[in-house]
């Protein structure tokens, strides 16, 4: 885990243990935004995972949607075939 991934993971854990119990469940989606962010970081790395998490947080509002919205699956790298 890189320094950035550890920092974001620590921030998510701090949010879940300190603020989340007092605020209550506010997220309109499943998995919650913090769970989505953790999974996106794990699957896509720090740069794309953060971008996906920010997009999800922006969608989580009264005018946005609701329901089941998991992070997209990671893309498998293309395998180039050399024909001889």
UniProtKB/Swiss-Prot annotation:
It is found in: Cell inner membrane. Residues 63-84 are annotated as: Disordered. Keywords: Cell inner membrane, Cell membrane, Membrane. It is a peripheral membrane protein. InterPro entries: Membr_insert_effic_factor_YidD (IPR002696). SMART domains: Haemolytic. Disulfide bonds: none annotated. GO terms for cellular component: plasma membrane. Pfam families: YidD. Could be involved in insertion of integral membrane proteins into the membrane. PANTHER family: MEMBRANE PROTEIN INSERTION EFFICIENCY FACTOR-RELATED. Belongs to the UPF0161 family. This is Putative membrane protein insertion efficiency factor. It comes from Caulobacter sp. (strain K31).
